[in-house]
Amino acid sequence: MASAVVNQSEAAAVRAPSKPVKTYSKENEQLVKQSWEILKKDAQRNGINFFRKVFEIAPGAKAMYSFLRDSTIPFEENPKVKNHARYVFMMTGDAAVQLGEKGAYQVLESKLQKLAATHVNAGVTDDQFEIVKEAILYAIEMGVPDLWSPELKSAWGDAYDMLAEQVKAEMHAQRSAATS
């Protein structure tokens, strides 16, 4: 994988300015934080729900995960799926709760280049981020059904959009650097 990763200084040199940042209100911040306190207690189950929904919407996405391609282990029993699902769900939630304090770029900065490179190498496209958004909102709804509301959906949707825009911008920068 290291050979496929773009020289980071080249990517930084061509990084396009990100789109205008959505406003992340105090109300949204509170809704996300309140629900995250509950969601993170069962991050593995919520992460499994998230990935189950991704693969329901886009069954071909399984091919992007080396640990699923040739596995005969049932999805929900696969220890690699469990670990990855928990990691992705925790990273997304932990980043979302920090948005009000730091902004999307600062929240992701330390992980952004590696995260983008992983997605570039897997062949992820911008439109696939919408599938992930639908799946993460589904997992949150399943994880906190008593709190779920249009306002909570909007708060998490805005948080996801802000984070996804930063990842996509870095992916574009890395792809541009690789072709120049």
Curated annotation (Swiss-Prot):
GO molecular function, a single term: oxygen binding
EC code: 1.7.2.-
Presence of keyword Cytoplasm: yes
UniProt subunit comment: Homodimer.
Principal subcellular localisation of the protein: cytoplasm
Family from the record: Belongs to the plant globin family.
Compartment(s) where it occurs, according to its Swiss-Prot or TrEMBL record: Cytoplasm; Nucleus
Taxonomic lineage: Eukaryota, Viridiplantae, Streptophyta, Embryophyta, Bryophyta
Regions that span the bilayer: none
Name the record gives this protein: Anaerobic nitrite reductase GLB0
Domain Globin: 23-172
Gene that produces this protein: GLB0
